Amino acid sequence: YVVLPEGSYLYDAKNHQLTLIVAGDYRGAVAGGQAFVKTAPVSLVLISDLSRFGDAKSPRSQLMGAMDAGIVSQNISIFCSAANLATVPRASMDNEQLKKVLKLKDSQMPMMNHPVGHFK
């Protein structure tokens, strides 16, 4: 998911486009108490659909979801480094608010986020 000042979007990889989920600035939900995140131009929120690994409540499914998010997080960090963009992988965020705002299913869990911006 992509959280911008004007709205929150789902990235559609097949069509390489963003689909608006909700209008409005929800960077505060991503911030998890860290004010700098509210000023980042964009935040990428990594969601894992644990039902893809079987029982969404099982420890194994949760581990697999966390591992997938970690792999994607590393790729985001590597790309940002190559593109001279600033980012930091974070796990603190308002999970319950993000679940509502992004209209997530019960099996979908916010795992990590990456605020992305320019170096100061």
Give the residues covered by each predicted segment.
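Acidic, surface-exposed loops and disordered segments
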Residues: 1-120
